[in-house]
């Protein structure tokens, strides 16, 4: 018996040594710069992401300082830090095929060697691709499938589509304003992350399914929604490293999952909420005689359910994944951008005064007379505040890897083999001191025409670029311009910071979206 165990462990040890040798000396990426330990095993990334808690992005920055602009960050992935190369990695759909990459890092077994373990990795990859989120458009790996899925959502999230639902946004903002006014001089402390989670969550659910949880009316605003999304966000690295855990959570009763893993329970709760939304939308479709097709008059999922998509694409489970991603993405990163802006505007009387002065004329007739989103965009100081809020909150903080499946990429003297995941991060581009002097400072003035650096727009990528850029960009921008215009206009509810510092908003940990240091309390205000 012991002999069998001994042979097994000897075989595993021999395989591990052979795999490390292959990765370091025979792998197609073996000549690329980077630390040997990162090239040898995914456990190095696991340590920085899971054990240290979303800190690999800072280790990657250190690698760039030591090894240069192109580095190998794990056995199979390249990261580049060169703003001029961004549009080569993130290309339009008519330039070349571009596929998304989701790693199964951390086990140390995901090699490309021809072996049983290589087959095991392939099986796990296939399982991952059919897992809870990968069925969603934004997580679709294949180029053509992503294009086919996205075209059904584009009309709702295009600039035209968003302008057609300005009324929905403005009605929600009026509710938000009324709720804040209702707390005037009450002495109550309000956490703005909960407020904005309610606001953004209500809007995206209403657009997607015509119904919303109406969180803006809840006594605690969107606290439960925010905590659920944030708790799941804190588990994202574990799920990326071990994607089969997501499938397992669906097989375990929610109460038991909650006891052992609040993060997994949060995912299960979000998934169930999305699943129920799609189920209800299908019931409504069955009762409907005619479905309106116009983006401004129908919900996203009514439109999709009545489209010419194949039946498999309209299955409840797959659309629930779409809903899950739209609901989560429509809240998490945008809340961080709002937090960044609220803190800096409320903590700087001069900035607040300048913004109010700029809004005085255009918002004079509000709410009877409402300017358009396009008119608000033309206000230079408001424009600068929105730009800085998104720059310093990063959008998606981590590198977003893309794969060129058909042709190699050339970066300077380096030829990157076709099929290699290549990523770049908004964190690097937004923190570039050559483009953004004093990059850590919140300076709306830097976006003014007389101070505008020619490369600032090149480096500003909170929504990414190319065929897979964030589909919700226009909705997010419209929400930001309108919320800031209404809440900082003359006569708006007067918000005052309560025990909030810059550390409460500065992203230091990468959980796809950046989050502040653990233990910070967010932006807390009182209405005076």
From Swiss-Prot:
Subcellular location: Membrane
Principal location class: membrane
Cellular component, GO, one term: membrane
Pathway terms, separated by semicolons: Secondary metabolite biosynthesis; terpenoid biosynthesis
Cofactors named for this entry: heme
GO MF entry, a single one: heme binding
CDD domains, per database record: CYP58-like
Binding locations of heme: 470
Gene3D superfamilies documented for this protein: Cytochrome P450
Family per record: Belongs to the cytochrome P450 family.
Protein name, entry field: Cytochrome P450 monooxygenase vrcB
Species this chain originates from: Aspergillus aculeatus (strain ATCC 16872 / CBS 172.66 / WB 5094)
Lineage: Eukaryota, Fungi, Dikarya, Ascomycota, Pezizomycotina
